[in-house]
Amino acid sequence: MIPRPQPHSGRWRAGAARRLTSLVAAAFAAATLLLTPALAPPASAGCPDAEVVFARGTGEPPGLGRVGQAFVSSLRQQTNKSIGTYGVNYPANGDFLAAADGANDASDHIQQMASACRATRLVLGGYSQGAAVIDIVTAAPLPGLGFTQPLPPAADDHIAAIALFGNPSGRAGGLMSALTPQFGSKTINLCNNGDPICSDGNRWRAHLGYVPGMTNQAARFVASRI
């Protein structure tokens, strides 16, 4: 009997990274079907009660992306708190290794906010390749991916919730859940039935169908935690 690689082994991580790469490439092929999203409004001056740090999906213009914008709009409707936003700065193209650029940018911003706005509750989110970006930020560093800005342990307390949509790690061995148990209870990881990026389905429309049902669901989850 051939032994299977265990979840924290180098072989397991390398295999998960390869599977994520192929899934993100597939998401890129479907990205042309996405509607052009509105850019996120700028956050108000000073430190907000909460801030959403969101990584958009493959092929979307800079900003929060369509799913991120809908999620933030719903969250604002469900709470009387001030909600700031930050769109993760990364290429969001077909090169999965560029997701590490987004992870470094998100981590740097999270650490800046934790230092400058200590009372602000941080919400991390991502759609499709953007969900993989957040996986990298919150997971143990993966060798060879170019992630060089791991979060210090003190940052964990500032992260109130994580909302992920169409996450490729759902088909790559559950990367996030295996490596980041401390965030498990804070995370809502949504996958549409039939979405080929996060499940074994083959319905590309499912990958584009997170608004408004699941963005509202995620907003309800997050609103109770900020």
Curated annotation (Swiss-Prot):
EC number per UniProt: 3.1.1.-
Pfam families documented for this protein: Cutinase
Cysteine disulfide partners in this protein: 47-117, 191-198
First-tier enzyme category under EC: hydrolase
Keywords: Cell membrane, Cell wall, Disulfide bond, Hydrolase, Membrane, Secreted, Serine esterase, Signal
Gene Ontology terms, MF aspect: carboxylesterase activity; hydrolase activity, acting on ester bonds; lipase activity; phospholipase A2 activity
Signal peptide positions on this chain: 1-45
Anything else known: Circulating B cells able to spontaneously generate specific antibodies directed against Culp4 are detected during active tuberculosis and in some latent-tuberculosis cases.
Protein role: A2-type phospholipase, which is probably involved in the degradation of macrophage membrane. Hydrolyzes dipalmitoylphosphatidylcholine. Also shows moderate esterase activity and hydrolyzes the p-nitrophenol-linked aliphatic ester pNP-butyrate (C4). Does not exhibit cutinase activity.
Stated name of the protein: Phospholipase Culp4
